[in-house]
Amino acid sequence: MMYGFQNEDFLKTLNGAVAQIGEINRIADKVSDLGYKNIYLVGTGGTYAIISPLAYMLKTNSALVWYHEIAAELLAAKPRSLTKDSLFITASLSGTTKETIAAAEYARSMGATVISFVGDRTAQLAAVSDYVVENAACNDNLVGELHIQFFALGARLMMKNGEFPQYERFVETLRKMPEVLLKVREQNDERALAFAEKHKDTGFHMCVGAGNTWGETYCFA
């Protein structure tokens, strides 16, 4: 089994993400009913990478206007399209990532609606957000957790926009992901170990990805 990996913790975290789908739907429905003109998907480091598949999902399935931004670059650029009619979506496990907090604060100063995903509702990022989704996690299971939650939010926003007719089937698939992803990990343990042993001393690694895998590639690199 993967070193330091705990099946119970993995399932608890991902099932926790699934349990938040109802709250995510409530948030998506409310902001959709209030109306917005564009969506900002913002992160720092790994969070910027992990939200990338949601950007690709919107790109290939929706007419919604979206922007995928690194928090610090957004602060430097101060895009004119970030306004009171924007949704600002971000995440931070600790809720203390300074660039993300600063970007969220700036977005709110422009009147944007801030939705954040955090591991602790008492963290600073939550305090500067309009809507907060809380689910405790750790680095071993954060990626799967955020994918479930980001995809649930994106799918609901598209559905409320009169798009994504496969919404119900998609969400039912998301609900199955904790067990499915655990099985994938277990099935690939030996393969991953063999790869690591073979290439642990390899001097140069090239990480290649495209489409909805680009973010994972960026994160790994």
Q: Language model features by range: what are they?
A:
Residues M2-N38, V133, N139-L142, A155-A221:
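Active-site phosphate/pyrophosphate-binding segments
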Residues D33-M177, A210, A221:
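Glycine-rich phosphate-binding loops that contact phosphosugars or nucleotide phosphates
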